Amino acid sequence: MWLSLPRSGYGSVATLTSKRVLACLTPLRQFSTSPAVSNANHKNVDNINKSPANDAANNAVEKGDKPTTSPEKLATKAEKSSANSVKAAANALGESNLSNSEQRRLDWIIMKDMLKYIWPKGKTSVKFRVLVAVALLVGAKLLNVQVPFFFKEIIDDMNIEWNSATALGVGITALIFSYGAARFGAVLFGELRNAIFASVAQKAIKEVATNVFRHLLKLDMAFHLSRQTGGITRAIDRGTKGISFVLSSMVFHIIPIALEISLVCGILSYNFGWKYALVTGATMVSYAIFTITTTSWRTKFRRNANRADNEASNVCLDSLINIEAVKSFGNEGYMVDKYQSALTKYEKASIKIATSLAFLNSGQNLIFSSALTAMMYMTCCGVADGSLTVGDLVLVNQLVFQLSVPLNFLGSVYRDLRQSLLDMGSLFSLQKVAGQIQESPNAKPLQLTNGEIRFENVTYGYHPDRPILKNASFVIPGGLKTAIVGPSGSGKSTILKLAFRFYDTQEGRILIDGQDVREVTLASLRSAIGVVPQDTPLFNDSIMNNIRFGRLEADDKEVENAACAAKLDALVRQLPDGWNTNVGERGMMISGGEKQRLAVARVLLKNSPVVFLDEATSALDTNTERQLLANMDQVLGDKTCVAIAHRLRTVADSDKIICLNQGGVEEEGTQAELLLKDGLYKSMWDAQEQVELGEEGIKEAEEKAAKKDV
């Protein structure tokens, strides 16, 4: 089929996220960011691992009128909309460099948006879980603070002369058991908190991921053809992993850390004086400033790693999706080198992440160790002059180390939180990508009578400076078979995409039974049209399920009948697994002709009143093609059928033939009428006849030679 735009299939995006492809991406996956893993590794682990162009036209168009908005203004609006979408998509894939202030602004927006998952409206069970988790958290912190006091009392009570006759008193024994119970209770409350809150985080992950996936499927073809799917899947993968950490951080880290630091500082100040409060306060301020400043500096390394990760994923995905081409041209080595080059970029960025992490950890440890040394010195002086006891020394030591836990969390949580927010920013940016194809607020379901399709002064081009259709006007009569033919680049397949509203016209309008396609709902429009594309999009699933994709509610018998009409039943009977035979990635385990018959079966099962056939039999042999076309003519009956064809013999029986050339209608009529005109169609027909007659002569000679040999 002649095309002016590289084809990717009418549903190929959905096939790109197969398990086989995603499996190759797992070596680059991040470490888990669940609360349990974060707590275990908080010190040393870093997560290295409504189209504006058409609104004016729609408002201006009345029945029989042309848009009053000039093509130049329409193009300008379309470019602005496209530019905004591209910018949002670039943010989503880590391809744009945000300043620190812009990144912080985005972080706050994300955290504000995540609050609705912690405290959702109308979901009492979720709110109850959050309240219980918070109560367990407070209980754990209070028990944690009690542990050093029990230890101090034990030390002071034990600071006596002991001999073999001395026994532990009831008080000391009770303190020892209280010490153990407090430690165990703090840990138990923490684990119960994690278990109870887990469902809240997982529900949020499911809801966000589903919303993003739904939005991606609603975006127009222009977006999907301009983006690399590998980068999108990685953005979703990283973003969903960050949701759990951000939610748990908001509930279990930020507020609790502030609470614990306040408790420890208050105790030190109350029990030991203002000097301890001064050291503690200076430590807090120094630690926070150093951590925030250093982490902000490190963010660019993480962004570079994400960009390299996306690049590697894209190379891997493209290689596996096009594995046949890779092997056919023997370019395995080239693709490996390309993949390794992307991994090298990821390696360099990851090394910078690791080395900057070492600097961060060292600086944090220096600040904390200095504070610990100062406090221990002051306490030892107090013990020496008798104002403090040995138990007080132990208490200060324990409280300072108690302070180290929230301090370390402050550093690691802020660091990991920034990384998670950076990853989530990509995920949420995908939701802000505005599709160029928008449904009108007043859209109504398409009402079909006879299925007439009318193009009125339609101008469209995939690029503004290269229009494919130029002020084209023609009518596809309802209930009849119409063929669209023409040389390469004349806009044949573009007509299908515009009728289906994969794209919107830049000028003019398209009417189906008198209804502008931009004024009807997308669901009703696309359910009314069935398509057999030249490049058949198949899923890595069974033959039965691939055909049933045309109408999901169809039963097995209906699927089998559609396959029989498409001459596919004979193939199925020969297969060991029959209808359950898997067709492989993009249908690579069956032949091109078999794929086309499967696509025909799918559209026959859909049973839509309008059918487009885009070179639907180009991969079939002559006999199978004739049988299939005869079957389809019988099955389609009085449906509106539009056949886009290169081989003119396959559409010679059409009720009407529209011949396109240079973006407009060159001529139209029946086969006989066009041959009498002696125009473009006649010249194309004669050229093909000469080729086919030559091929038939060669075939006859080969058959005669074979009989002679026998």
Swiss-Prot record:
Molecular function per GO: ABC-type transporter activity; ATP binding; ATP hydrolysis activity; ATPase-coupled transmembrane transporter activity
Residue positions binding glutathione: 298-302, 361-364, 411
Disulfide bond residue pairs: none
Recorded coiled-coil stretches: none
Mitochondrial intermembrane topological intervals: 152-173, 271, 378-392
SMART domains attached to this UniProt entry: AAA (SM00382)
Matches recorded under SUPFAM superfamilies: ABC transporter transmembrane region, P-loop containing nucleoside triphosphate hydrolases
Record has Membrane as a keyword: yes
Polar residues bias: start-end ranges: 35-52
Transit peptide: 1-38
Topology term for the membrane: Multi-pass membrane protein
Cellular component GO terms held in the UniProt record: mitochondrial inner membrane
Start and end residues of each ABC transporter domain: 453-687
Chain sites annotated for binding ATP: 462, 486-497
GO biological process per UniProt: intracellular iron ion homeostasis; transmembrane transport
EC number: 7.-.-.-
UniProt keyword list: ATP-binding, Membrane, Mitochondrion, Mitochondrion inner membrane, Nucleotide-binding, Transit peptide, Translocase, Transmembrane, Transmembrane helix, Transport
Record field: transmembrane: 130-151, 174-197, 247-270, 272-292, 359-377, 393-414
Function: Performs an essential function in the generation of cytoplasmic iron-sulfur proteins by mediating the ATP-dependent export of Fe/S cluster precursors synthesized by NFS1 and other mitochondrial proteins. Hydrolyzes ATP. Binds glutathione and may function by transporting a glutathione-conjugated iron-sulfur compound.
Subunit structure comment from the entry: Homodimer.
UniProt similarity note: Belongs to the ABC transporter superfamily. ABCB family. Heavy Metal importer (TC 3.A.1.210) subfamily.
Protein name: Iron-sulfur clusters transporter ATM1, mitochondrial
Native organism: Yarrowia lipolytica (strain CLIB 122 / E 150) (Yeast)
Lineage: Eukaryota, Fungi, Dikarya, Ascomycota, Saccharomycotina
